């Protein structure tokens, strides 16, 4: 498409890209860089400690950090700063679920909003108020199906920088669970599947709040096999190493997760994914080709059987699948189509 002037308005709580955990910020970082590389005039509104190939503007010199996440004051200040000169841009791309969306609806300029989260009652009420005045992008068809009445500019999968992920054909003798300790993320299911299959588990887990801590300490750890390796939150480099060496990644979620980046990250490393069919899983994992989608009803037996079959999965097929569907380039092309629709519509 012809070059457009794009304002990328990131959430204000973490740097872009983030220093650690922060899926939205990773996506924004890749998108801002990818659009710039494609010849678009991109301005990223984020915190001053962000790094980007786009032009960077900020109010807050440093990200306030995870403790401030969902704090509306930071969000409102950054949003109003980004919107102060609307004529400078052809399209605003908003990534925060709060004030950015509401402000974008009264800009008089095309506003695209990516639905990074789930549709809880508060978000549903907000989206209902502006559903005809902003363009929405879902990050999976499963997410879109939960609120089909919105004004969609399309479905665009979250992309990753595939060449940055180490591809490894030969694997070590462990399976990996990587994620938060929240019950819906499925750490306990991962433990049970590894036990049933008789394989060693490595669990790299972030404990984010008291409820997660309670679940982790009272439900998961007492069932953890003695030969398991239990890690806390890992660095980006450690994550990539763990993903590339694992025989498989377990993703046994128990909620309608709109998109799970760890699945694409694992497959980019040539590592198959074994997951339950919730949220975007059936769209992301090619069952029998890049991993196995196993039923909740027959868990953990079916997951254990799948773990014994991971040798049937070609690591090169996993990598090729991600390059085709979930690369940075595929994501940029998807958003270019969304912007074209928003600007022309």
Give residue ranges: language-model regions.
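Catalytic cores of nucleotide-sugar-dependent glycosyltransferases that transfer UDP/GDP/TDP-activated
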Residues: 1-345
């Amino acid at each position: 498409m012809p070059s457009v002037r794009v304002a990328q308005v990131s959430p204000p709580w973490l740097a872009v890209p983030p220093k650690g955990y922060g899926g939205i910020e990773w996506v924004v970082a890749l998108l801002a860089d990818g659009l710039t590389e494609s010849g678009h005039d991109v301005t990223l509104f984020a915190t001053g400690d962000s790094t980007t190939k786009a032009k960077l503007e900020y109010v807050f010199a440093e990200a306030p950090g995870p403790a401030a996440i969902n704090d509306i004051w930071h969000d409102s200040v950054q949003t109003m700063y980004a919107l102060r000169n609307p004529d400078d841009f052809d399209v605003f791309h908003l990534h925060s679920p709060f004030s950015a969306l509401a402000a974008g609806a009264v800009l008089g300029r095309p506003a695209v909003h990516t639905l990074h989260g789930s549709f809880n009652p508060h978000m549903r009420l907000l989206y209902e108020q502006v559903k005809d005045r902003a363009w929405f992008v879902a990050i999976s068809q499963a997410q879109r199906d939960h609120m089909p009445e919105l004004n969609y500019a399309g479905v665009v999968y979250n992309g990753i920088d595939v060449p940055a992920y180490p591809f490894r054909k030969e694997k070590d003798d462990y399976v990996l669970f990587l994620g938060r300790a929240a019950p819906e993320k499925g750490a306990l299911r991962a433990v049970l599947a590894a036990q049933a299959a008789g394989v060693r588990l490595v669990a790299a887990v972030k404990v984010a709040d008291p409820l997660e801590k309670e679940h982790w300490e009272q439900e998961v750890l007492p069932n953890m096999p003695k030969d398991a390796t239990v890690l806390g939150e890992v660095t980006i480099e450690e994550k990539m190493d763990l993903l590339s060496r694992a025989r498989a990644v377990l993703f046994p979620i128990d909620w309608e997760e709109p998109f799970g980046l760890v699945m694409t990250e694992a497959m980019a490393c040539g590592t198959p994914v074994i997951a339950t069919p919730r949220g975007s899983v059936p769209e992301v994992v090619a069952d029998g080709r890049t991993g196995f989608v196993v039923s909740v009803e027959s868990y953990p037996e079916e997951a254990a059987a799948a773990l014994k079959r991971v040798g049937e999965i070609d690591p090169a097929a996993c990598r090729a699948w991600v390059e085709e569907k979930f690369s940075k380039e595929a994501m940029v092309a998807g958003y270019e189509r969304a912007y074209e629709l928003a600007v022309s519509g």
